[in-house]
A protein has these predicted regions:
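Conserved ABC ATPase "signature" region
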Residues: 27-49, 109, 129, 141-158
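The feature captures the beta-strand-to-loop junction immediately N-terminal to the Walker
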Residues: 77-79
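Conserved catalytic segment of ABC-fold P-loop ATPases
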Residues: 230-237
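Conserved H-loop
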Residues: 224-230
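Pre-NBD coupling/linker segments of ABC/ABC-like ATPases
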Residues: 2-63
Length: 244
């Protein structure tokens, strides 16, 4: 088994901004584009014009490379817009990188944006079992963790309510409880301390510390430098999509 839990190699993510939305082309339009497109591109190049696609893009990540070993606790820090959340979305396969590659070796539990991974029409109870099934757990395994998850999240009274009716704080509490208690080998957490009261934040830090002491890998995005210093062994600093 490899010693590397997470590897990013030359990772880049580009987004198109502005411009018209893409639509399906007719067969006639596709044939015309196939013939005329290269001719127009050569003409534009000779005139020194740039392609519109090149003008209207933004790189959220560019040439990001790092390794996280099994059992390490690593913080990801940087200003708003530095690319931290985009990095976790690429690592969790929510979005594909434009260039480079990301490698994850182990079962992943993650909490990204509020409600990510939950089906809004399903109840809290149903979403707990759905999340466990997605992680490859058997029902008996989830049963053993169920009470602990519910107690940590503090949503006992709302277990049979669809999560679309949960407040953002309730969704984050349940999402973190599911991610941290279903025995992930790798835990990816994005700004969980930005939502919830001080008591919940303290519980989250305590649970992440327990996960780390159990030999699991943790990648923790946060603006809370004190929390990163206390919890993490090292940190990755992102600035405008680049590792600094």
């Amino acid at each position: 088994m490899t010693d590397i839990a997470i590897r990013a190699e030359g990772l880049g993510k580009r987004y198109r901004i502005g411009g018209p939305q893409a639509r399906y082309k007719t067969l006639r339009e596709s044939l015309i584009e196939a013939v005329a497109g290269p001719v127009r591109a050569v003409g534009a190049a000779l005139r020194g014009e740039r392609n519109g696609a090149e003008r209207d893009v933004i790189w959220a990540l560019r040439d990001v490379s790092f390794d996280v070993r099994h059992g390490e606790v690593v913080g990801v820090i940087g200003r708003n817009g530095a690319g931290k959340s985009t990095l976790l979305k690429v690592l969790t396969r929510i979005t594909e990188p434009t260039e480079g590659y990301a490698e994850i070796n182990g079962r992943v539990g993650s909490l990204l944006e509020v409600g990510t991974g939950f089906h809004p029409e399903l109840t809290g109870r149903e979403n707990i079992y759905l999340s466990g099934a997605i992680l490859g757990m058997k029902k008996a395994e989830i049963d053993r963790k169920f009470d602990e998850i519910v107690d940590f999240a503090g949503v006992e009274k709302f277990l049979d309510t669809p999560v679309k009716h949960y407040s953002s704080g309730m969704q984050v509490r349940l999402g973190f409880a599911v991610a941290a208690h279903l025995d992930p080998e790798i835990l990816l957490i994005d700004e969980v301390l930005a939502v919830g009261d001080a008591e919940f934040q303290k519980k989250c830090l305590g649970k992440m510390s327990d996960v780390a002491k159990g030999g699991r890998t943790v990648l923790f995005v946060s603006h809370n430098m004190a929390a990163v210093e206390n919890l993490c062994q090292k940190a990755v600093m992102l600035d405008e999509g680049n590792v600094t």
